Amino acid sequence: MSELRGSWDEQQQSMAYLPDADMDTVAASTSLPDPAGDFDRNVPRICGVCGDRATGFHFNAMTCEGCKGFFRRSMKRKAMFTCPFNGDCKITKDNRRHCQACRLKRCVDIGMMKEFILTDEEVQRKREMILKRKEEEALKESLKPKLSEEQQKVIDTLLEAHHKTFDTTYSDFNKFRPPVRSKFSSRMATHSSSVVSQDFSSEDSNDVFGSDAFAAFPEPMEPQMFSNLDLSEESDESPSMNIELPHLPMLPHLADLVSYSIQKVIGFAKMIPGFRDLTAEDQIALLKSSAIEVIMLRSNQSFTMEDMSWTCGSNDFKYKVSDVTQAGHSMDLLEPLVKFQVGLKKLNLHEEEHVLLMAICILSPDRPGVQDTSLVESIQDRLSDILQTYIRCRHPPPGSRLLYAKMIQKLADLRSLNEEHSKQYRCLSFQPEHSMQLTPLVLEVFGNEIS
């Protein structure tokens, strides 16, 4: 009996932490959960005493509420009943009040035990435990960070901006110069592609060209936005810039794709709360420096880890590493790019986190050419605060663990990718037969990059 009482006390303590428990009902009933889930929820449960609809296990037996209460009252009063008939009455829902003796006998026969009935002290203790639990839950909820109405509005604005500048059908790709894939170049790039897809378990990588796929329908690019801007810089003559590049059959198509993506990045940036408060010169400086990084971020939506490619609709617009090599880029960019894409994909970001990360990337006060760094920093800090609050409120563990730090690390990785892209772009653009394939927008945005 002591073992039974001990196990019962343990059960009472665990039951006190069941959420949304009705205090009086739980305290009085001492109902048990269905053993091992043996009962199908869709099958009606029958009271073992009277045949009425059962509500669960009460005092170690499946009974209805009426028989549960009858047994509890009888045991507490130590009632002694006598059957007025032959002591073998059949108890039903309709006649269960007629013979209390046979009803109580039936309760005992199906396994109901008085040891499962709480004493008055236990009832009080249970009520106190339930009340304490509710108070703890209320305190926990009150201390939980919440997105303010203003913060939610910023997120909604960024989501709308992304949806307006991201065409998931990729229908505009048909307007680009068609992709031309050289079989010879493809064979040359096959080894490179296989190397890239081998061991990307924990690192991240990301691609400019895959990203263009995400750009969608915002407002058309305004060429004058980038005109008359003097961001001249000395040309870093490096050995790679003197390399003679072969025929690049994919360059025209991917140049159009990147140009299209730049337009979408501009459309997205113009809708970031606070961006239009900056001077036109600072807006241009931020866009020119961050465009390729945001394109890489956007491209993650179409990136597929199964074959390390960017799938943008039909097979014509499925881009592999070999396609990008046929546009003039080498594995010095593509290998870390794919690693970046894999790492970013594994973070399983919510769309809200993704758009906030893009906005934070654009609003970086340390971009070259930015004049009002204080204003840019204040806008970025606001976006960072919203991102951290969102993660605490809306991103459940374990995915939320160190998520903000991991996202910020992705921005650092993008800087390295940006620098390598600049080097390879210069090498490409210095050869007239290749630079003539680029669009005016690409030439304007990447032409004066500061690496």
From Swiss-Prot:
Query: Biological process GO annotation list?
Result: calcium ion transport; cell differentiation; intracellular receptor signaling pathway; negative regulation of transcription by RNA polymerase II; positive regulation of transcription by RNA polymerase II; response to vitamin D; vitamin D receptor signaling pathway
Ranges annotated as DNA-binding: 44-112
Q: Which GO terms describe its cellular component?
A: caveola; cytoplasm; nucleus; plasma membrane
InterPro entries attached to this UniProt entry? DBD_VDR, NHR-like_dom_sf, Nucl_hrmn_rcpt_lig-bd, Nuclear_hormone_rcpt_NR1, Nuclear_hrmn_rcpt, VitD_rcpt, Znf_hrmn_rcpt, Znf_NHR/GATA
Q: Where does Zn(2+) 2 bind?
A: 83, 89, 99, 102
Domain NR LBD positions: 150-447
Looking up SMART domains in the UniProt record yields: HOLI, ZnF_C4
Q: Where does Zn(2+) 1 bind?
A: 47, 50, 64, 67
One Pfam family cited in the UniProt record for this chain = Hormone_recep
Tissue expression: Expressed in kidney and intestine.
Could you list the residue ranges that cross the membrane?
none
Q: Where in the cell is it found?
A: Nucleus; Cytoplasm
Q: Which GO terms describe its molecular function?
A: nuclear receptor activity; RNA polymerase II cis-regulatory region sequence-specific DNA binding; vitamin D binding; zinc ion binding
Q: Region Hinge: which residues?
A: 113-149, 120-149
**Stored CDD domains:** NR_DBD_VDR, NR_LBD_VDR
Which residues are recorded as binding calcitriol? 261, 298, 302, 329, 421
- Residue spans, zinc finger NR C4-type: 47-67, 83-107
- Short sequence motif named 9aaTAD, residue ranges: 440-448
Q: What is its main location?
A: nucleus
Q: Where is this region: Interaction with coactivator LXXLL motif?
A: 270-288
**UniProtKB keywords:** Cytoplasm, DNA-binding, Metal-binding, Nucleus, Receptor, Transcription, Transcription regulation, Zinc, Zinc-finger
Q: How does it assemble?
A: Homodimer in the absence of bound vitamin D3. Heterodimer with RXRA after vitamin D3 binding.
Function, in words = Nuclear receptor for calcitriol, the active form of vitamin D3 which mediates the action of this vitamin on cells. Enters the nucleus upon vitamin D3 binding where it forms heterodimers with the retinoid X receptor/RXR. The VDR-RXR heterodimers bind to specific response elements on DNA and activate the transcription of vitamin D3-responsive target genes. Plays a central role in calcium homeostasis. Also functions as a receptor for the secondary bile acid lithocholic acid (LCA) and its metabolites.
Which PANTHER family is this protein grouped with? NUCLEAR HORMONE RECEPTOR, VITAMIN D3 RECEPTOR
Question: Record's domain comment?
Answer: Composed of three domains: a modulating N-terminal domain, a DNA-binding domain and a C-terminal ligand-binding domain. The 9aaTAD motif is a transactivation domain present in a large number of yeast and animal transcription factors.
> What is the protein name given in its UniProt record?
Vitamin D3 receptor
